[in-house]
């Protein structure tokens, strides 16, 4: 038995008429669908049961044979085979055409495939196919030329002149004869000769024709198959007809299109039988051609065929195209069973790995499991009975449900799923009500809030799926963000506020200076009101649990607060006692300044000490990162839960409220504003006198008001009260920031007009005073623009992610080490003097290419090919090293993917990346997901030229699509010295002259451009002469691939870092490498490749290797930079490309070439329903055989042995630390 699910690759080709007939189960001769009286399919019609199979299982049309026992019998009365009705989804029919018809895809696409094969223009072809002109097929011994077009009149004249000496015809039959006459081998040989001498337009055309003729020759497709004698009819259940109430029918558009084809075909047959005049027959043939065109691709030529209400009918091509087409709707995005959705509400009582599932949803989702248990425990007699019990909701059902859902994780997903953290696994806990309960800490990963968001639940059914959900997707596992390796589950809002309030210090509150013997005593005193949470007190260190104090500290008394004692209880025991929010305290030890000798006057000592700042959101994040680094997943998730509970508890105790009295009045405000008005007046006077231009006046006015706003903000910060609830909220990072506060208590400042220009009229009032009508009106512009921007940005960002995923979906970690000897030299990314991305962040989690040596001592810090950890990265930077050569995705030699060493650490887990990790998809999500945070607009600074550099999302799109950038910089093509920069006021241009070793070049740059070089500078080729963005395609011509890759990486990082978004370099490297994986062949040498062909670097190297081994001359090529859309469409997989964009074009091309899809990427395998070749679906993991272990093998430990061993190892590690 062949396993239909096991195949290596998938091929597409043109179908010959014989092939179409062999698929068919019978010819459809009548346009009828079903009989409206009996509602049975008509014989020989579009739904005929003889052709397509029975409409009811195991029952023929006339009802003579019913039941399964007649399986396989063909009824002698109605001719219907007795079988399952689902064969109506797979059996095809056909229509024998009375005249050949051209296939619109091959005639109409750009370039016209038929036109290239016949060397005719598409216009000429159209005239022939649609019966406007005759074409000469055999000129005989006349003066006519082959393939010459003749009008009706010319044809008649020539017939009179030459009689039957020549053959000419019109319509698709003529084209078919011409295609049959094409001698592929001869044409190919002739074109190859032509190529040797041809140039320009002629050469391009020759290469194009050669390409297509070679394709036909190699694939075994006949060119004449582009014209069809017979049309397949797709199975009826794929174009259903359903009865609506009221006796009307709804039908698929395809049935209408097929009906028109059959009607016209039958009419044509009748006309031919009657020997009708040729003009009538021609007209009918043309109509048949148009009907078939509409069936295959309605609207491609002329006006589309419309149905009721002037709606164009959906043809076969439309069934595949677009978001609603077969590819994206049914193959890449399927609906799944065992799923539900509901509104989410917060579940603060949950553990990190739990979610609350409403009971009625759970019983529906886990129905089969519960039913099985009911039958197995003999509570129910059979499955039917068990189902009834569940539907009635009997008591024993709920007990069993509780047991069934234990240890059975479910997946929660929130749309839009922008990155892999948008789907996580949780263990369900049954809850009352109808809402799903979500753990508050995972909200950030999902970007969820509880204002009515909904989430979907999915149940992993089989053992493997459950194991994967538990091991890889459990929410407690997903603590780090894959885009930068920082924790994604930092506490927010109330949790931050609670911990902030808990760790505050205040002067002179009750109980200040008291001394306690241990924690419990201090906490008891607080609970009974003797000590305030924020009062500084003394505690004996010896009794503070097992905290790692130094010997010097152990003899002394620690000055801290009750709040901090409580806060430290949730920390791991090995952590230093956290008394101040500093890195030193977190990573080294509690600073000595908080310890005093026993017998000191503690209240007096406390009065001298400054107050310590409380722990803010950022500090909590650092604590979590440190816990993760030292203790890994389990401990971190427990610790997060403790932090969450503590935060909620103490934010409740704190009782933060906001009232109007909390917004204080700033008395200096009026004076500042009056001063600003005076300055503006002075500036206006200067403008009136003509001392400054209008642009300068505008710039200065804006500057004055911004200055006033900043001054007010500064005054507000200075007069801020530390116990002010609004200040506490913004300072802790719980909600809001200082600019919100300025708008409440200071002034709102300047607003943007609808065109993005800043208006000179400031809003002087703040929200406490209230705005005037005019101010209110001005401020609505900005608010509206904000809303529209966000909406547009979301769509743009989503589309960017889709393109990124498509281009990188087949990049998977394929092997351990590719053995490359190349590397990438990296340094900190700078913009002017400002560091955009420091070196240690770029080094972290990468493998070195060469060993790194300390510049002063000469000691080796790290050897070659070793992983750089946090500590090593810091050590390298501290040693003053500025450049390090590392292994990079750019220089990896692995085919169709990356190796472990070139990729380095997996940012999402903090450990080495595993073979099988789908790093391409992760990279695409990491770049696409923050896309919504980037700004939309191109910044236009008021009237200053040369400053319009695109930023934000448009710039990212510009880079990844490899477009010519706006505000392009001029680059030099030679390495040398700038010898002259001259200005020509007449032409308003500057000329820059560079003297290289061999030649001297002069570049003209616009007068307004800001120069980046000065006379006497030594510059390298590819260096920019002016400010602006470099065109990467130009850079590629001047420099090598690695320089371009490096430039693109720096540019992308710049955009994201300017917006405060951190992304790991390796994600951008993966994407950029995909843009540069193709080459264009310049000279084919002795290979079979055509000049100008685009191909994969790996494939090109293989072909050249074979040629060299055979003793031939290898081909030469040059690298090509493709934008991500273009790169996706150029992939080797036609399934992946067709499901991305331009479906018909991709399929047309693939069919002619008889392309084989090797099914290497993820998308292709999802489409055909195979398990994806990444992660556990990789061959090396699927084909593992269980090894037989001897009965009493010495290598088999019991679980308890292993646990004891691990505990001992951990203890050793801690001692070594």
From Swiss-Prot:
Its EC number is 2.7.7.6. Keywords: DNA-directed RNA polymerase, Magnesium, Metal-binding, Nucleotidyltransferase, Transcription, Transferase, Zinc. One of its GO terms (molecular function) is magnesium ion binding. Its cofactor is Mg(2+); Zn(2+). Binds 1 Mg(2+) ion per subunit. GO terms for cellular component: DNA-directed RNA polymerase complex. It holds the Pfam family RNA_pol_Rpb1_1. Mg(2+) binds at residues 449, 451, 453. GO terms for biological process: DNA-templated transcription. InterPro entries: DNA-dir_RpoC_beta_prime, DNA-dir_RpoC_beta_prime_bact, RNA_pol_asu, RNA_pol_N, RNA_pol_Rpb1_1, RNA_pol_Rpb1_3, RNA_pol_Rpb1_3_sf, RNA_pol_Rpb1_4. SUPFAM superfamilies: beta and beta-prime subunits of DNA dependent RNA-polymerase. It catalyses: RNA(n) + a ribonucleoside 5'-triphosphate = RNA(n+1) + diphosphate. DNA-dependent RNA polymerase catalyzes the transcription of DNA into RNA using the four ribonucleoside triphosphates as substrates. The RNAP catalytic core consists of 2 alpha, 1 beta, 1 beta' and 1 omega subunit. When a sigma factor is associated with the core the holoenzyme is formed, which can initiate transcription. Belongs to the RNA polymerase beta' chain family. PANTHER family: DNA-DIRECTED RNA POLYMERASE, DNA-DIRECTED RNA POLYMERASE SUBUNIT BETA. This is DNA-directed RNA polymerase subunit beta'. The lineage of its organism: Bacteria, Bacillati, Bacillota, Bacilli, Lactobacillales. The gene is rpoC.
């Amino acid at each position: 038995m062949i396993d239909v699910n096991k195949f290596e690759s998938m091929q597409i080709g043109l179908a010959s008429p014989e092939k179409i007939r062999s698929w068919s189960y019978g010819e459809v001769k009548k346009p009828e669908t079903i009989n409206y009286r009996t509602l049975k399919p008509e014989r020989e019609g579009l739904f005929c049961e003889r052709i397509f199979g029975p409409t009811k299982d195991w029952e023929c049309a006339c009802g003579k044979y019913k039941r399964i026992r007649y399986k396989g019998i063909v009824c002698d009365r109605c001719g219907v085979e007795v079988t399952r009705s689902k064969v109506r989804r797979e059996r095809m029919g056909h229509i024998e055409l009375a005249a050949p018809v051209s296939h619109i895809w091959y005639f109409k696409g750009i370039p016209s495939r038929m036109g290239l094969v016949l060397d005719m223009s598409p216009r000429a072809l159209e005239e022939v196919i649609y019966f406007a002109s005759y074409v000469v097929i055999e000129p005989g011994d006349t003066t006519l030329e082959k393939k010459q077009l003749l009008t009706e009149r010319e044809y008649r004249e020539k017939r009179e002149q030459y009689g039957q000496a020549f053959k000419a015809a019109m319509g698709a039959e003529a084209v078919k004869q011409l295609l049959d006459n094409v001698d592929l081998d001869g044409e190919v040989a002739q074109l190859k000769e032509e190529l040797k001498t041809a140039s320009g337009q002629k050469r391009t055309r020759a290469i194009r024709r050669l390409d297509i003729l070679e394709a036909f020759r190699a694939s075994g497709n006949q060119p004449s198959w582009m014209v069809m004698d017979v049309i397949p009819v797709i199975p009826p259940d794929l174009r259903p007809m359903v009865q609506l109430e009221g006796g009307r029918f709804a039908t698929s558009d395809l049935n209408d299109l097929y009906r028109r084809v059959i009607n016209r075909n039958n009419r044509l047959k009748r006309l031919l039988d009657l020997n009708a005049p040729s003009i009538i027959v021609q007209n009918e043939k043309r109509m048949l051609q148009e009907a078939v065109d509409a069936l295959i691709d309605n609207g491609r030529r002329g006006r589309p065929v419309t149905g009721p209400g002037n709606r164009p009918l959906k043809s076969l091509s439309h069934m595949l195209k677009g978001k609603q087409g077969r590819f994206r709707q049914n193959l890449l995005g399927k609906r799944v069973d065992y799923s539900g959705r509901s509104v989410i509400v917060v579940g603060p009582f949950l553990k990190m790995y739990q979610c609350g599932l409403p009971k009625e949803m759970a019983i529906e989702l886990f129905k089969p499991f519960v039913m099985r248990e009911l039958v197995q425990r003999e509570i129910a007699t059979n499955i039917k009975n068990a189902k009834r019990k569940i539907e009635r909701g009997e008591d024993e059902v709920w007990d069993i449900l509780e047991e069934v859902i234990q240890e059975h994780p479910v997946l929660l997903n929130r749309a839009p799923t922008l990155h892999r953290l948008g789907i996580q696994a949780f263990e369900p806990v049954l809850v009352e009500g109808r809402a799903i309960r979500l753990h508050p800490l995972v909200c950030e990963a999902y970007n969820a809030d509880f204002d009515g968001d909904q989430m979907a639940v999915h149940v992993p059914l089989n053992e493997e799926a459950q194991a994967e959900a538990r091991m890889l997707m459990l929410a407690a596992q997903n603590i780090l963000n894959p885009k930068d390796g920082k924790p994604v589950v930092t506490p927010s809002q109330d949790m931050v506020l609670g911990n902030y309030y808990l760790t505050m210090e205040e002067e002179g509150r009750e109980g200040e200076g008291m001394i306690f013997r241990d924690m419990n005593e201090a906490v008891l005193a607080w609970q009974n009101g003797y000590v305030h949470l924020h009062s500084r007190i003394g505690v004996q260190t010896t009794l503070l649990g097992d905290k790692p104090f130094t010997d010097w500290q152990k003899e002394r008394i620690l000055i801290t607060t009750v709040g901090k004692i409580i806060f430290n209880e949730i920390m791991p025991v090995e952590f230093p006692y956290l008394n101040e929010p500093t890195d030193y305290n977190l990573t080294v030890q509690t600073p000595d300044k908080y310890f005093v000798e026993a017998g000191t006057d503690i209240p007096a000592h406390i009065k001298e000490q400054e107050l310590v700042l409380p722990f803010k959101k950022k500090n909590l994040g650092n604590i979590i990162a440190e816990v993760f680094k030292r203790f890994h997943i389990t401990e971190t998730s427990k610790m997060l839960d403790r932090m969450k509970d503590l935060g909620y508890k103490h934010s409740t105790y704190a009782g933060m409220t906001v009232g109007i009295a909390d917004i204080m009045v700033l008395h200096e405000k009026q004076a500042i504003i009056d001063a600003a008005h005076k300055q503006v007046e002075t500036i206006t006077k200067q403008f009136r006198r003509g001392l400054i231009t209008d642009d300068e006046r505008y710039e200065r006015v804006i500057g004055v008001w911004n200055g006033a706003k900043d001054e007010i903000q500064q005054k507000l910060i200075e007069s801020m009260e530390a116990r002010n609830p609004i200040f506490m909220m913004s300072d802790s990072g719980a909600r809001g920031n200082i600019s919100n506060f300025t708008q409440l208590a200071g002034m709102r400042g300047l607003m943007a007009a609808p065109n993005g220009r800043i208006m000179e009229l400031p809003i002087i009032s703040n929200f406490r005073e209230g705005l005037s009508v005019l101010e209110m009106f001005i401020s609505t512009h900005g608010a509206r623009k904000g809303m529209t921007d966000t909406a547009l940005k979301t769509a743009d960002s989503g589309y960017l992610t889709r393109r990124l995923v498509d281009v990188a979906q087949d990049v998977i970690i394929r092997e351990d080490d590719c053995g490359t000897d190349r590397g990438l030299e990296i340094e900190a990314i700078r913009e002017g003097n400002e560091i955009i991305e420091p070196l240690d962040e770029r080094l972290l989690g990468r493998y070195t290419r060469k060993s790194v040596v300390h510049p002063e001592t000469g000691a080796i810090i790290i050897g070659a090919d070793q992983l750089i950890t946090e500590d090593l990265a810091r050590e390298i930077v501290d040693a003053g090293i500025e450049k390090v050569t590392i292994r990079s995705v750019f220089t990896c030699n692995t085919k169709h993917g990356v190796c472990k060493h070139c990729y380095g650490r997996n940012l999402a887990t903090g450990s080495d990346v595993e073979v099988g990790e789908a790093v391409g998809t992760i990279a695409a999500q990491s770049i696409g997901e923050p896309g919504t945070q980037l700004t939309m607009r191109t910044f236009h600074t008021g009237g200053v030229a040369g400053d319009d550099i695109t930023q934000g999302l448009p710039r990212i799109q510009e880079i990844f699509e490899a477009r010519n950038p706006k505000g392009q910089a001029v680059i030099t093509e030679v390495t040398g010295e700038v010898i002259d920069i001259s200005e020509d006021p007449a032409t308003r241009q500057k000329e820059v002259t560079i003297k290289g070793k061999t030649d001297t070049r002069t570049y003209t740059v616009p007068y307004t451009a800001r120069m980046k070089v000065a006379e006497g500078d030594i510059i390298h080729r590819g260096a920019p002469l002016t400010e602006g963005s470099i065109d990467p395609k130009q850079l590629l011509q001047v420099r090598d691939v690695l320089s371009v890759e490096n430039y693109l990486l720096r540019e992308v990082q710049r955009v994201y870092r300017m917006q405060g978004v951190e992304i790991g370099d390796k994600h951008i490297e993966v994407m950029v490498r995909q843009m540069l994986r193709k080459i264009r062949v310049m000279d084919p040498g002795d290979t079979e490749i055509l000049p100008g062909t685009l191909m994969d670097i790996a494939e090109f190297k293989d072909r050249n290797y074979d040629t060299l081994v055979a003793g031939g001359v290898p081909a030469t090529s040059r690298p090509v930079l493709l934008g991500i859309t273009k790169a996706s469409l150029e992939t080797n997989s036609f399934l992946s490309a067709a499901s991305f964009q331009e479906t018909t074009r991709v399929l047309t091309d693939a069919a002619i070439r008889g392309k084989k899809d090797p099914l290497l990427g993820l998308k292709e395998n999802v489409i055909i329903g195979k398990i994806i070749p990444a992660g556990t679906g990789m061959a090396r993991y699927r084909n593992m055989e269980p090894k037989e272990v001897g009965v009493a093998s010495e290598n088999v430990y019991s679980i308890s042995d292993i646990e004891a061993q691990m505990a001992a190892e951990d203890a050793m590690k801690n001692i070594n630390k």
